[in-house]
Amino acid sequence: MSAAGVPAELNNLGAPITATTQNPSGLANSQVTSGPVSSATQHDEHRSSAGNTLADEEDDKAVEAEKAEAIDAAGDGKQKRLPADSSEDIVAELEPHHVSVHRGKEEFAALERKYSNLSQRSQHELHRPTTRHSVRSSFSRKDRVVSRLTQDDAEKAKEGEGEFNLVEVLRSGRENQDEAGIKRKAVGVVWEDHEVIGAGGMRINIRNFSSAIIEQFMMPAIKVLGIFGFNPFAPKPKAILHPSSGLLKPGEMCLVLGRPEAGCTTFLKTITNQRAGYMEINGNVEYAGVGWKEMRKRYAGEVVYNQEDDDHLPTLTVAQTIRFALATKTPKKKIPGVSAKQFQDDMLDLLLSMLNIKHTANTIVGNAFVRGVSGGERKRVSIAEMFCSGATVCSWDNSTRGLDASTALDYAKSLRLLTDIMGQTTFVSLYQAGEGIYDQFDKVLVLNEGHVAYFGPAKEARQYMIGLGYRDLPRQTTADYLSGCTDVNERRFADGRDATNVPATPEEMGQAYRESEICARMTREREEYKHLMAEDATARENFKQAVLEQKHKGVGKKSPYTVSFLQQVFIIFKRQLRLKFQDHFGISTGFATSIIIALIVGSVYFRLPETASGAFTRGGLLFLGLLFNALTSFSELPSQMLGRSVLYRQNEYRFYRPAAFALAAVLADVPYNASVIFLFSIVLYFMGGLYSSGGAFFMFFLFVFLTFMVMSAFFRTLGVATSDYNVAARLASVLISFMVTYTGYMIPVQRMKRWLFWIFYLNPLSYGYEAIFANEFSRISLTCDSSYTIPRNIPEAGITGYPDTLGPNQMCSIFGSTPGDPNVSGSDYMAVGYSYYKAHIWRNFGILLGFFTFFMFLQMLFIEVLEQGAKHFSINVYKKEDKDLKAKNERLAERREAFRAGELEQDLSELKMRPEPFTWEGLSYTVPVPGGHRQLLNDIYGYVKPGSLTALMGASGAGKTTLLDVLASRKNIGVVEGDILMNGRPIGTDFQRGCAYAEQQDTHEWTTTVREALQYSAYLRQPQHVPKQEKDDYVEDIIELLELQELADAMIGFPNYGLSVEARKRVTIGVELAAKPELLLFLDEPTSGLDGQSAYNIVRFLKKLCAAGQKILCTIHQPNALLFQSFDRLLLLQRGGECVYFGDIGPDSKVLIDYLERNGAEVPHDANPAEFMLEAIGAGSRKRIGSDWGEKWRNSPEFAEVKREIQELKAEALAKPIEEKSNRTEYATSFLFQLKTVLHRTNVALWRNADYQWTRLFAHLAIGLIVTLTFLQLDNSVQSLQYRVFAIFFATVLPALILAQIEPQYIMSRMTFNREASSKMYSSTVFALTQLLSEMPYSLGCAVSFFLLLYYGVGFPYASSRAGYFFLMILVTEVYAVTLGQAVAALSPTILIAALFNPFLLVLFSIFCGVTAPPPTLPYFWRKWMWPLDPFTRLISGLVSTVLQDQEVVCKDGEYQVFPAPSGQTCQQWAGAFAEAVGGYINNPDSTGDCQFCQYRSGQAFFVPLEISFSTRWRDFGIFICYVVFNILVLLIAARFLKWQRR
């Protein structure tokens, strides 16, 4: 195997070398062989049924030589046509829209430049070969060399040093496969009567808080009805794709076109067996004669779908992402002498080189929230990953979104090349496909609302539509023309034709196609292929044999996976380890959090004495040590659910079984979690003074870690068992509350209510706690110190007659003590008090292992059986229509028909623009980077005149968005140099308000409807004096303009639950247009993600705005020639932020073309100037034409003219008097108007955010109910006295639940605010106040529900003064938690950082409030300042004193402390004075035998020693209010000064 033949096993990652082409008749296919064929028999096996064959092998070689010569000629820039009379039916002349494999091969030389871009070899090469003849063990006798990339590839490769010959690599791979006897995979796709039925037929209203509650209680009834086949809420079936048939042969590419909602995505998914989410799929789909069911079961990884969004694990590098995919798909059968690692290294090198992303190999992939590679590079990672799947049938959904024109063409040609040489069968849907892209396809499928309007040869599609009666639009690209014919607003009929005599409706177009000659031809071709597959099973058997040869040992013949289950586990295990240990921030914060918490807890319980006073606190220390680590595992729940989309896609590629992922993920977490828990245990254990021995410590660590693993498995299981995070969170809140309550710490098992004690035995925490409790107490003996001796001396009360040491008539007041014995065995203490026994330790170990095994089994079962992140088609939900909305929608419908008929046009005459020129001179922008600074923009000049539309274009990463941000004053980091002037003067405070900026990211308040989003923009950004009705009318005009009539009342939502990508983009533009910007309109990629017609509509409207006097600066990625011609002026940037052209485009781009040609770039007559200019300056992966274009621009007369024009514009502007306007303020509206409007929107948003509020209320109800059932109607016993305090302590749990919800909500809302604040819609103070005020109604509702359940359920005092105070404290607790959460969120840049504050705050507040560690037991350091500073101290103090004041206490049997009276004395005489002094009583004062002492007579006796006073409860209330006020001040200040938006 040669160096160029690195991927000799490409057959195992692709399909056969043969490439299917069509002869002029379109009926038959012929095969192009990319490498020598080993035998005539093998050659015949790949022969087309209707195509001609080569006479013999010599003829074959001759043709191959001619093709190679043609390729070489093309590489030299010459044109050499293959013989027209060759046996492969290669036509001599190619028609304008003709697509053939051979013309693609003539362009291979260009692809060699475009996909290599490699630098000269350096000492940092990834592989060893450095000379043309260096050979590795895996190379064949043909020593071709694949040049290697270095970190400087992107720049050096432009100079053409070391070209990467992709054709040679792929062909060599084929030759080596044949030599090794590796079978080829050739799979044609046949679909017949293929029909897809989805949900539809009913308008779904927006869910809100009330409907969520109703659903919760109605859902059980609905499910029961569903069992009997009756569901009134079931969606009605709707045909998404109507029956259609077709064939795509191996080596063919099909372009799928259609307007949004035409069914393109549905076709791509279902044709590749992605059937989840649809109600019904009818018809038949076969793959080389293999039925879709068998294909799904045994060969699922051979038929794959690539979604539009690029969803990867963001913290893995590009190389790691691709290498992982390769590892799971490395075939067993490879070229002799090639190891698995060599194969993976070579394939990785090939893919990085081929896709020109080698310079990003060690850069993390990133996503919308994690900074990584660019969007275009991320798209290429998706392409590489899908290629690694080795699939033979691939479908790509809008894969060029976000790519510039040159890169998009590169991508299309790469698919063409891979399809040709690898024999893949490829379906692609694209928006805005240029002519160069369209020419790569063999066939095209045009869909119109699910009906097939055309399926056949791509070269004949345009003429077919013209033949139907549609007018030819020569300036439109073929792809746009075809999809435009399905759009009633865009299509044009030929002269003398109209909708009455031309197939116009979807049904009519479908019928016309079915009756056409092309359809008949496609039918014959399909039947011939089916007949061939039925008669000759060679292709099918070769495919099955090739798949079988890939499988490793341990993989079943019927399994769709390549490597065994254990191999999958190992591969995933390594990936998860990398994920964990590459997250340096997460690791460091995890260790820091754990150690700091351990230090705090350990210092509170520092060196606990082995005495009676240390018994309860020792149990508290053990409980906290176990509970903290166990609940830390809760983080597994969101992480399990967030990774579903990647898991689902990679499982669809059949990289691994989901169960393998479940097992590997758990194993990979062990090293990190064990290390964290070990350090935590060391600090806590030895600081707390627990039993000092190695065996005791490691037993403690073992059970803490094992309990953590059990809880981790439990939360993972919960995550895979539920489809919605909010549902999982609600379940978790209930289960965690039960687990914590029934651990055995607060309530020993023998004292639990009989109807709930069984929870203790189903609770993993109880077994872990008993084990560490028994491990500790079985090793120690407790000495009774004086404060626990009964009776004892109390000098301050004048009681001094008792022995100084415990005598025979005294006892220790702890469990397990006996009269006269000063020592209490730890075993007796835990046996009597908790029913814990040392003998249970290893029993509990086995039980915990059983729990772990059970949860892991359930997790692996659920993750295999239940759908994990399956993508369903998007649905829209609508605001319920009232009378006003109905009238507006009827008016929109009427006007829509008038617009279609050409009777109406948008009236822009009322727009008021300020005719002021906008100029910039010498503009540079520099940002700080590690180790120095980086210049992103370099000395740029330009201007925008009133009434002009200026395009800003350039390569990805050239600085287009950066320039827009700088010009729009959106940057808040770095240094901007140069002058930015409006009307010849520095920009003023009203500049940002007077400009509109449609950003590339479509960031909106997701709960608003389209109409509401536009209305809020109009209300807050248009001057306040403009009447509301006028603003509303203008919003309706914008809705018409953007063709959003049917979506006007649809909620914006988020992907798969709301508007589609292209509709969301139109809303983004509409929001900015609704502001009626007076100064300038900036748009960043307004047409990205839109189909050609939508893009043209947007640009057409921008032209209308310009005609009304607007100034517009707009970046654009993939304009076709017609779209490009709509712009007046162009600003072109090259990499490095340098301007290479600024000036007029001219009619037919004449001015721009003249400039390019004068500087050495000859523009082909049929080229799209927008694409060619990018290639000329090296914007794509092709080498630039000529020398530095930036230097050429700076030395050009055009540049000098630009500077002169800028000076003229400035002089003219300065000569005019300044027009003073009263509304030139920072904000368009007053503070109160902003507050009122934004508060209304936020209230609506929270009301519609149903799951957010319902989850919060549900948690309060659940905890309140659990506490009530646990402590139901407590009596007046000592035990009940303590339980009252524990019940009150549950009020401190509420802030933990609230913080977990409030912080993400605030931070996500802040993202929307940051976008809107950039446009000066409203102030940060308004944002913070509305976020706070809108939460208050829900805080009140939660407080009422929790109070009613807790207060009256437990049986607290009924007096209104007590109940009223208790409710006020609960209400303030709710408000405090909300303000604290929002303050923490305002101080935090991300949700993760905010979440890191929570453990510190909650642990501190809970420990120091006086319940788990009473104030007298706290170390002096903490007791002096932290206990009085703790907000929960005020909460507990106020509630405990209110509930227990004057509470009578009567001991039950078993609660008395029993000790004998001295001979000759009664119990009253012996202990009466003591009992009176400590607030207890003697139950049998006259007895001379055993005395029964009750520790408490009233509630005061319990809380006074804890330094709690009933008289200070209103002071505590006031101090608690002060904490709320403090949080609000922090919130307002942080919101004002901390935007956390680096731009």
UniProtKB/Swiss-Prot annotation:
Residues 222-474, 918-1160 form the ABC transporter domain. Keywords: ATP-binding, Cell membrane, Glycoprotein, Membrane, Nucleotide-binding, Repeat, Transmembrane, Transmembrane helix, Transport. It is found in: Cell membrane. PROSITE patterns: ABC_TRANSPORTER_1 (PS00211), ABC_TRANSPORTER_2 (PS50893). Gene3D superfamilies: P-loop containing nucleotide triphosphate hydrolases. PANTHER family: ATP-BINDING CASSETTE TRANSPORTER. This is ABC multidrug transporter AFR1. It comes from Cryptococcus neoformans var. grubii serotype A (strain H99 / ATCC 208821 / CBS 10515 / FGSC 9487) (Filobasidiella neoformans var. grubii). The lineage of its organism: Eukaryota, Fungi, Dikarya, Basidiomycota, Agaricomycotina.
